[in-house]
Structures are given as structure tokens and as C-alpha cells.
Amino acid sequence: RLFNFARRNLDWNLSQRPASPSQLKQNYSSSIPISNEMATPVNTTDRLKHLRELMASAKYNINAYVVPSEDAHQSEYVAACDERRAFISGFNGSAGCAIVTMDKAAMFTDGRYFLQARQQMDDNWTLMKRGIPGVPSPQDYLAEHLPEGTRVGIDPTLMTATEANELKEKLQARGNGDLVAIEDNLVDIVWGKDRPERPKNTVFIHDIKYAGESHDSKVARVREFIEKENASGLVVSALDEIAWLFNLRGTDIDFNPVFFAYAVVTRDKVTLYIDEAKLTDAVRSHLSGVVVRPYHEIFGELNTLSSSLVETKSHLLVSSSTSFALVQALGTDNVKMSKSPITHLKAIKNAAELEGMRQCHIRDGAALANYFGWLENELLNKDGNLRLSEVDVADKLEELRREQEHCVGLSFSTISSVGANGAIIHYSPQRGSDALLDITKMYLCDSGGQYLDGTTDVTRTYHFGEPTAWERECFTRVLKGHIALDRAVFPNGTSGFALDPLARMPLWELGLDYRHGTGHGVGSFLNVHEGPQGVSMRKTIIDAGFNAGMTITNEPGYYEDGNFGIRIENTCLVVKADTKFDYTGGSGYLKFEPVTMVPIQKKLISSELFTDVERKWLNDYHQEVWRKVSPRLEKGSLGYEWLKRETSPM
């Protein structure tokens, strides 16, 4: 959301129009045009000049303009046509908020992107390091650091109603000015004809054997919530929620199988607002009973609906992530803010989805075993050392992943990072400026795949030479935190906020830490990041407790600027724990079941820091990896022999 920054810059190049899942393998590609964005800052002088001319014009007459990362659906990941903040600033990380005044340009981002933002932005921009003492939030910056009478412009489709109202109140309370909703997006005007076109790719049906529940059943469960809230209906704007609700998938946003649409569910009607050119005959048949309307008509129809809501003294439910523009169309008196029921329904995976997650991670593990077996051989036995680049090997990993059954592409752009690049937490290598693999340095690889039966996300850190004692200690402390979180048993409903310190304590003992959350939910052939659950120090997740059926990643790390990065990530299922007693009185206890099946490098472990309990955990985990993954590998192959060695007992 606008000021609640997300995790990672992910690009999924799905430029084709697959009519069915069978076409996805050949159409999904990450072979995108490569630039030197990480090496050379973008010159934004002319862009900012044009933007400020628009701001100063009589038509708009504003003193500041807010450019968020999100699109009209408050998506974490956006299509190329919606990368407005990246265009105006040059910084293309997934998390950030740009504020442009008549004489300043400020970029607010968090610790995951400090290095990347500094590299990608020119001298026109000031980096505002979120989380550092003394650095204001974007709201406080606007309210406290601008002169009295300031008019702050926003695109109302790109800011949530909650955030817009909070900012407006702050501005007015301090007497500094007002919030101005501008229908035209000023960055789009500056961008002009060079702005990419909005995708119009066809959508396809997500088979019931993978979804595990019909869309009619899902709608019925949503209606139960609507009736419980004594409301007339629910407005759905989050793209992954719409895809989940209708058992449809799309290719409008890179790496994310979603499509541009809105939906309104009432007690007696379901309306899907979508470009009808996206619908095949099969999808139209699938949507029997659903009213289909053009995408942009939702604003007019909500405005018309507002009159009947006034007459009946009823309300439509909207979530806190609903845009200011949608709430304006309905009228604030006609809406009731509520947590979207779909967020929680989607987070609790059914039996088919859980089995799909287990199976796709086994196949993903086979791809990674083949990859690391190949990579080690290239570096140590061939001439790959100081020849293969970060992009070269990332491309090889994608090739091997796509060979797996049901794989249709990547779930995010592979973070393939050597040495100092590993310290850029969400580094995105670009051909031409990417580093060469070096067996004297750490190699961090964070990657994932999209499969018809699930989504994967895994990080491993390896050293193909001789690690230093300090590298081994840091790695071991990260692993100790990973194991501590994995072994946790906790009451049903416990928040990840309470569990997060388990992963950090081994680092805290030395006064070390990492500037990112420890875990996030993972979709089922959907977005690689989903809520409401998470493991983090952020208080926003306190109310999002764990329930059986959820997914979560476990990914502590440690990063030294200019030196190396370490992260160990497994995707896990939240399952019931069999405890001797039940102090909860019936709600029971939970634990994590790791489904990622990839070895953790023993060579990087300092045995003197490792306890017997931790050693047993690692050996048990590796035994499970070998049992599940080895049957999928060719005996005697590089991947098979690598997996056999790496999963041998410590």
C-alpha cells in the first residue's frame, strides 16, 4: 500500500496471450530487454522539469505531488504501464514512495533498498531512509516540512481511502494545506507516448483439481460474511482476491498470474468488471451466472448504486486497501470499512492446495539440485569461475525449472548475487553490469517458480571455495535462527510478531540484525507474497494470527555492505501440532512443516556454535529432502550426486 512498503521488485514477462494453461510454458519468459539500471543512474532532470510545469499550471495548481509504487488495485507488483515511481525517479525497487515539490524530490524507502536506491537515482533525488531515527514518514514530511497553504496532489486511484483521509486530516490539522484528488495522472502525461500499453491478455480457468473448491462455493462463503456484517455487498479490488474468487488466472502482471478486474458481490448478484476481450468462450461458460461488465464502468455503476444505498440505509463493504477513487464513487456514508473476507479465506489452503504446495516444492527441489550440481561442476571442474555471470546462471536455473511438470514460469525475478551484491537485499542482476561468479565469494540465490499446483520461494547461500571463519559464524547464526523458528510450537492464533524474535536472537547476541521481515504468506499459483499472516517486527501483523492451512516463509538473513549477504529461506505450511496437553481449552497448537526441499550447505556451518538439537534438525531435514527429491533425479547425474553428498549426515 502507499506507505506500507512491500518486499521485492519482481518482473514476470508474460507478453503473450495464452488461451489455456497448456500454452503457458512456451509463452512465459523472463528474456526481457536488459539495461544497466543497477550501474547507471537515470537522468531525471527533464522528467522532473515537465512534472513541475504541470504542477504549477492553472489547471492543477499544486505544490507537491505524491507518486506511489502501487497501481489502481493497490498491488505490490505492477504492470510496466503502472511503474510510475520507477519512471519518474529511476529507482525500480518494489518498495518506495516519491514526493515531488517545486524544489525537492524525495524518495522514501526501507532498509532493503538503501543501496539500490542510491545507485539508481541521480542527484535530483534525496534518499529518505525509512526506519532510521530522525527520518520522517512520507505523511509527516508532507504535513511538517512544507509551507502553510500547501496543496498536495494525488491520483485518487493509487491511494487507499484510509491513507488519503489520514493524510488529509494531518495536513488540515497543522494548517498546512489540503489534499487534492486529480483525475489525470501527471506522471502519465510526462511519460507520454513512451508509456507501455496496458496488457489485454486473455484469462484462463484454474482447474478445480488444483483450486479444490468451485467459485460458486467461494461466493457462497463470501455472502455468509456479507450477511454477518449486515451489509448489502462487498467491493473487491485486489487482483489476487478476484483471481482466487472466480478460479481464474491471467498474465497481466509480470510473475503474478492475475488480471485487471474489479468485482462486486451482493446478496443476489455477482458482477465482474473486466475488458471483455480477455474472455474466451470457455471462460464465459465458466462464469455462467456472473454478470460481466466493462472494466472502467465500475466507477459509474457504484455512483449509481449509491442512491439506492442511501434509500435503504445500507452499506457496501470495502477493505482498507480500497482506493480513494472507489470510495468517492460510492460516497463515504455508503461504505463500511472491513477486513476483506477473501484475504483470510484465500490464506487458508484446502486439501488440494496443500497437496499441490507439497508436490510442486518437490519438483522445484529437483530443479535446484540439478542447478547446483551443474553450477558446482562448472565452477570447479570447468572454466566457469570468473566467466559465468549472475545472469548466465540465473538463466540456467530458469531453464531447469521450466523442465519440471506443471511449471509455467517464475514467481519473481531470480536474485542471483555474488559477494557484495548479496548485501543488496533485493538485488536484480542486469546483463552487462552483473558480476562474475567467484569461488572465493559467497553466492546467494533467491528464486521461485509458478506451477499450476502451487507457488515456490526458496533462498540458499553457498560458498564454492573456502569460506572465512567470520562468514561461517554469520551463516551459522542465521541458520540457528531459521531452525529456532522452524521448531516453534505455538497456540492457534499466535501472531508472527510474537515469533519473529526467535529468528533474530542468535544474531542479536552479537548485536547484529537484518532489515527485512522474516516471513510472508505464499499464494497457491498466485502471488508469491500474500497476507494477512507474516513473521515480522511490524505491528501491522499483530492481529493476523496463524491458523492451520496457512503458508509462511522462514527467511532470516544477515548482510554486510560491500562484502556478502546471507539468507536461508524455506516455504512452510502451518499445521496442527500434536501436544501432550492443551492449555488452550480446545483451539490447540500449531507448528511449521517445511515444504522446500533443498539442502543447506554444511560447509558453511561452524560446528562449535551448533547444538546437538540443531544438528539433529538438519540431518532429519536433509534425510527428508533426499527421500523426496532423489527419485526425481537421474541416478549418477550431477544433480543426483550433488544431492547425495549435500544431504549426507552432518
Where are these regions (language model features)?
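Compositionally biased, intrinsically disordered low-complexity segments enriched in Pro/Arg/Gln/His
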Residues: 21-23
